[in-house]
A protein has these predicted regions:
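WD40-repeat beta-propeller superdomains and closely related acidic/aromatic-rich repeat-like regions
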Residues: 2-367
Length: 367
């Protein structure tokens, strides 16, 4: 899952640059905001098959989505109108992400390609072939929007330069267990680290240096000499040699808090884990979902975590306490993706029920 980019919202009825819109307003406490209320604002319909992924444009005015019908769709947030459908992928579209300037939309597919589009017009600009790779299943942009990393059904991670489409580097572990899929990737908001998770619950943190070199800071893997079973799958922290509690099967979602101090992972074992960075010391394990956790998002102030699951629910968590304070059950299929709007006041959810739902919190505006 990708880091959120914050923006200052205009006051209702004000124009950008006006005195009202530039006046100092107190920052939103998103824990209070999402505790007060959460209401469905709009449902976007038009996908003919299940939806894997959804993303807000940086200006908060457009949604991009992709799914099993092989199309990328772009929507007007305020009206729910379908703006355009982008054609080119030949298999499920698993990931969509806008660059911070909104000029480029990157999409990844099970057809083994990453496509770059004009973020405003939807015109295709580049195709990044993944050669001998398998399905592309996650994408992450560096905070400056210059580097794009992909996770796939392959054991390595590739990073491209967005502006040129040039492949910059391939990250590949050096231990005997590095033959499993690197399915999930996430750049930290400070741009220092790249995290990735595998289909067996391994967690790896990379430091991508300006020279283009990579340094493995922590390398999780199976405990050596232990039989391969779901009871022994987990991660291993090399600093102290301690084998932690198992995280069965693959990691379905990864994200960071905005200050880059905590890495959050969600897994097929139905748990969410919080780790202190950069040493991957487990802080909390959150339970409550009854299905595979597919997506995670953190509010701009780092106080609220939202999770989406195959159990058809969306859960809101107080990150400080680990308490689940709200559960949404409005989708009728697995919820595959959730994402906050740039200002943190809206949430979009994409589901296998072929709909995208838009949610708002806080006090309801007067009619």
């Amino acid at each position: 899952m990708m880091p959120e980019h914050t923006m200052t919202p205009s006051l209702p009825g004000s124009l950008p640059g006006s005195a009202a819109s530039t006046a100092q307003t107190p920052p939103t406490d998103f824990l209070d905001y999402w505790k007060l209320d959460c209401r469905e604002v709009r449902t976007f319909r038009g996908h003919s098959h299940g939806i894997w992924t959804v993303a807000f444009s940086p200006d908060g005015l457009t949604l991009a989505s992709g799914g099993a019908e092989r199309l990328v769709r772009m929507w007007d947030i305020e009206t729910g109108r379908l703006l355009r459908s982008l054609r080119g992928h030949t298999n499920d579209v698993r990931a969509v992400v806008f660059t911070p300037d909104g000029q480029t939309l990157a999409t990844g597919s099970e057809d083994r390609t990453i496509r770059l589009w004009n973020g405003k017009t939807g015109e295709p600009t580049k195709i990044l072939f993944t050669r001998y790779d398998h399905n592309v299943c996650s994408l992450s942009l560096s905070p400056d929007g210059l580097m794009l990393a992909r996770g796939s059904h392959n054991k390595d991670i590739k990073i491209w330069e967005v502006t040129t489409g040039t492949e910059l580097m391939t990250l590949l572990g050096k231990d005997e267990y590095d033959h499993h899929w690197s399915v999930c990737v996430a750049f930290s908001p400070d741009g220092i680290h790249l995290a990735h998770g595998t289909d067996i619950g391994k967690i790896k943190i990379w430091e991508v240096l300006p020279s283009g070199e990579e340094k493995v800071l922590h390398d999780g893997h199976w405990r050596r000499g232990v039989e391969d079973s779901t009871e022994t799958r987990g991660y291993y922290i090399e600093d102290d040699g301690g084998f932690q509690k198992p995280m069965d099967y693959w990691i379905g979602a990864m994200t960071f808090t905005p200050d880059a101090k905590i890495l959050i992972t969600g897994s097929r074992d139905r748990t969410i884990k919080l780790f202190d960075m950069p040493h991957l010391i487990e802080k909390k394990s959150l339970t409550g979902h009854t299905g595979w956790i597919r997506s995670l998002a953190v509010s701009p102030d780092g106080k609220v975590l939202v999770s989406a699951s195959d159990d058809q629910t969306i859960k809101f968590w107080d990150l400080a306490t680990g308490r689940n304070f709200r559960t949404l059950k409005d989708h009728t299929g697995a919820v595959r993706c959730i994402t906050f709007s740039p200002d943190g006041k809206r949430l979009a959810s994409a589901s296998w029920d072929r709909t995208i739902k838009l949610w708002e919190g806080g006090a309801k505006a007067e009619e």
